[in-house]
Amino acid sequence: MRNALGRHILCEAYGCDPKVLNDRKLVERIMVEAALNAGAEVREVAFHKFSPQGVSGVVVISESHLTIHTWPELGYAAIDVFTCGDTVDPWNALDYLVKHFGAENTVSSEVRRGVMQHAMVKIS
């Protein structure tokens, strides 16, 4: 992660299991497990179940966050995994999520956040 403060993965997950995506407790558990399996330190967890369907949530980790917004009726989930530092690989967390949500297809991209090679920092 040279010259960057963090790595932010954006994932479009298609063909996911609708029953899983609509279960707030299960989505929360999978998200927390993904963070822990990647070696992250979980700080806060907040999830909400929408009516008639859908779940949104965030797992705040010491290294940044994991977020999700689900559309069970479409079998779709929008997932973000953002990690700072070099101790947690966001792809490990994402692989866990994709597997446990049963995604048939994903489109993912990684953005390097806080690219500092041209930044000038003045501390007074």
Predicted regions and their residues:
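Polybasic/polar functional segments that serve as interface/processing modules
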Residues: 1-124
